[in-house]
């Protein structure tokens, strides 16, 4: 077993690991590449996204990750140095992990700023750290990209070996079975909360409303009516129907949202244009217009079963338009397309009153410093208990007359 080598920047330059404990018919070796562009798209997608014609998880698609790099959004310059971990057997790709060397904690949505501050107060360096995630994307999905348990075990071992050159390893928004595997390797479980809507076989939006309590049903109808009375009309554009001018308008709205919060946007027009060109089947744009002029829009990303609410912005303020573009239109779209889930993202208890229920999301964390690891383990136990109570309290405020069952 050869331990990973690093340069002065903390960037991995080579990695060769043979994990005999999980090797079956042939040896598996792991190596690092510093750009998704070093991996042919069909090779990566066969490993990460076997679904067709629409990816099982478009955020792991080669085209999505390449757009992040080529647009300059996720690069060493922005604090996201790509470190894709590849597991190979007989020269063929058997597994992969989207790893990044991070010099900050922005754009992650599992917040560890307090951990970094504690390290700094004790004269320790928290950065660079090693992160497994999709940049700027708090969406769940596989992180140990492999077809069998043995390969996933090998990936976990290789990632932890690589992490010994850094302060820590963080695997964000992973599925339960992967987190369980990582826990068995000594990583710490962390829980957080998002809000998802589930399709209970609704015929249309009115059918969905009929499952809500009278007050919630009344409130939603009033909110939608007020948007119509403001003279706003909505259009849903998909795929090739989203033209260059639409992307330009959306990017203006996206930048406006960040400007209103006095922050810099993570993404740019080039990124969105690349998505429209390379992943058109996964793109959905909700466009709000008044008197024939576009005034606001939201971007949704879809796969075969799920629609994901991603970004929103408006050039004119219309009360309640945010709810229409970001919740009601996506729910209508999901019902129309017979999709199972609409993921509305993190934060905002107001979502529960609009039919999005709390869902726990999971991440796994390993810290090299033993004393900090013990302290954070104790913190995560307390935090996890608090998250469980929070979810129970939210569910007590369910807007549904009866809890819907996904169909």
Regions found by a protein language model. Give the residues of each.
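N-acyltransferase acceptor-side catalytic subdomain
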Residues: 7, 11-407
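Ser/Thr/Pro/Gly-rich low-complexity, intrinsically disordered segments
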Residues: 1-4
């Amino acid at each position: 077993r050869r331990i990973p080598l690093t340069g002065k920047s903390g960037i991995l330059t080579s990695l060769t690991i043979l994990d005999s404990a999980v090797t079956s018919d042939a040896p598996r070796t792991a190596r690092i590449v510093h750009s998704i562009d070093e991996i042919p798209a069909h090779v990566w997608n066969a490993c990460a996204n076997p679904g067709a014609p629409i990816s099982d998880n478009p955020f792991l698609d080669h085209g999505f990750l390449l757009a992040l790099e080529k647009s300059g959004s996720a690069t060493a310059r922005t604090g996201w140095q790509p470190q894709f971990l590849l597991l190979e057997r007989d020269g063929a790709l058997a597994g992969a992990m989207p790893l990044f060397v991070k010099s900050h904690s922005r754009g992650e949505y599992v917040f560890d700023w307090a951990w970094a501050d504690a390290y700094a107060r004790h004269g320790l360096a928290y950065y660079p750290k090693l992160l497994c995630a999709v940049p700027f994307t708090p969406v769940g999905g596989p992180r140990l990209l492999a077809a069998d348990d043995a390969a996933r075990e090998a990936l976990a071992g290789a990632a932890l070996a690589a992490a010994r050159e850094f302060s820590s390893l963080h695997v964000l928004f992973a599925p339960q079975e992967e987190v369980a595997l990582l826990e068995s390797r000594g990583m710490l479980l962390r829980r957080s909360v998002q809000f998802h809507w589930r399709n209970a076989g609704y015929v249309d939006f009115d059918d969905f409303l009929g499952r809500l309590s009278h007050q919630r049903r009344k409130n939603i109808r009033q909110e939608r009516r007020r948007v119509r009375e403001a003279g706003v009309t909505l259009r849903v554009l998909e795929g090739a129907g989203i033209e260059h001018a639409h992307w330009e308008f959306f990017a203006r709205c996206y930048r406006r949202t960040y400007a209103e919060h006095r922050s810099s946007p993570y993404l740019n027009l080039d990124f969105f244009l690349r998505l429209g060109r390379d992943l058109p089947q996964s793109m959905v744009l909700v466009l709000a217009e008044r008197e024939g002029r576009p005034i606001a829009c939201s971007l949704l990303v879809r796969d075969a079963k799920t629609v994901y609410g991603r970004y929103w912005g408006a050039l004119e303020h219309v009360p309640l338009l945010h709810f229409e573009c970001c919740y009601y239109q996506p729910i209508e779209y999901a019902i129309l397309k017979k999709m199972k889930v609409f993921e509305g993202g993190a934060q905002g208890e107001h979502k529960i009153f609009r039919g999005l229920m709390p869902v726990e999301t999971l991440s796994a964390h390993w810290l090299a410093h033993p004393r900090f690891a013990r302290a954070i383990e104790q913190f995560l136990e307390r935090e996890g208990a608090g998250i469980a109570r929070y979810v129970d309290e939210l569910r007590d405020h369910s807007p549904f007359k009866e809890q819907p069952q996904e169909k």
